[in-house]
């Protein structure tokens, strides 16, 4: 009987602890993801086939694409505050990350390469820094890490997770690519699919 009582008490403690922890996050609790299994379909010419469904890892058909939510106000690094409306005519890659995320760091070489290769051709990259821990909320820490990581594109803090929630993000890192009319055309969670992302950028720049 004593053993059963101890077990019941342990289960109750775990449940209460889980509820308390869940209350810390006003959204689905995020996780860091490693390389995800590719789900896109790439043709022989390197193009990602457009589909009407609004799923991850596919190029969403323009007629079915939803307008991208606004980027909430925050502290901007490497740029003055930017509104998506001002970027009409440009392809925009929004990268949800946090500097303490190992998987996010693994994506940075590709993001920096894409920025260098396509900025003058019409691509804008915005890093939305949605923190996991308190130390990642301090602007001085974010500025330091952005500098030390060699990030030249715009970064905006999202300490209250407003932009995170608006885009329905659930994990770090998540990449969202918008077309020239500000519509969500591609979304990928985790590392990987770098070639597919570049192909999507090329296709959207050509539209």
Region spans (language model):
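Structural microenvironment flanking redox-active thiols in thiol-disulfide oxidoreductases
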Residues: 105-149, 159-165
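N-proximal helix/coil linker or "cap" segments that precede and/or mark the start of modular domains
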Residues: 20-72, 88, 207
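Short active-site neighborhood of thiol/selenol oxidoreductases, capturing the structured segment around
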Residues: 82-105, 111, 125
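Hydrophobic membrane-insertion alpha-helices, especially the h-region
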Residues: 8-21
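Positively charged n-region of N-terminal signal peptides that target proteins for export
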Residues: 1-4
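Thiol/disulfide oxidoreductase modules built on the thioredoxin-like
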Residues: 90, 145-153, 157-202
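A short beta-strand-turn-helix
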Residues: 70-92, 115-118
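Proline-centered helix-kink/hinge sites
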Residues: 69, 102-103, 109-113, 154, ...
């Amino acid at each position: 009987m004593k053993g059963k009582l101890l077990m019941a008490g342990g289960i109750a403690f775990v449940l209460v602890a889980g509820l308390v922890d869940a209350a810390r996050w006003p959204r689905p609790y995020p996780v860091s993801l490693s390389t995800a299994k590719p789900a896109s379909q790439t043709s022989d010419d390197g193009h990602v086939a457009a589909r009407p469904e609004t799923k991850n890892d596919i190029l969403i058909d323009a007629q079915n694409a939803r307008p991208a939510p606004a980027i909430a106000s925050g502290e901007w690094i490497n740029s003055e505050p930017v509104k998506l409306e001002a970027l009409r005519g440009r392809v925009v890659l929004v990268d949800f990350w946090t500097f303490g995320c190992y998987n996010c760091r693994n994506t940075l070489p590709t993001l920096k390469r894409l920025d260098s290769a396509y900025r003058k051709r019409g691509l804008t990259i915005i890093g939305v820094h949605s923190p996991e821990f308190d130390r990642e909320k301090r602007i001085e820490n974010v500025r330091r890490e952005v500098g030390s990581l060699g990030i030249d594109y715009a970064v905006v803090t999202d300490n209250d997770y407003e932009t995170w929630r608006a885009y329905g993000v659930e994990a770090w890192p998540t990449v969202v690519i918008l077309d020239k009319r500000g519509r969500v055309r591609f979304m990928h969670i985790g590392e990987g699919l770098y070639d597919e992302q570049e192909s999507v950028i090329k296709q959207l720049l050509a539209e």
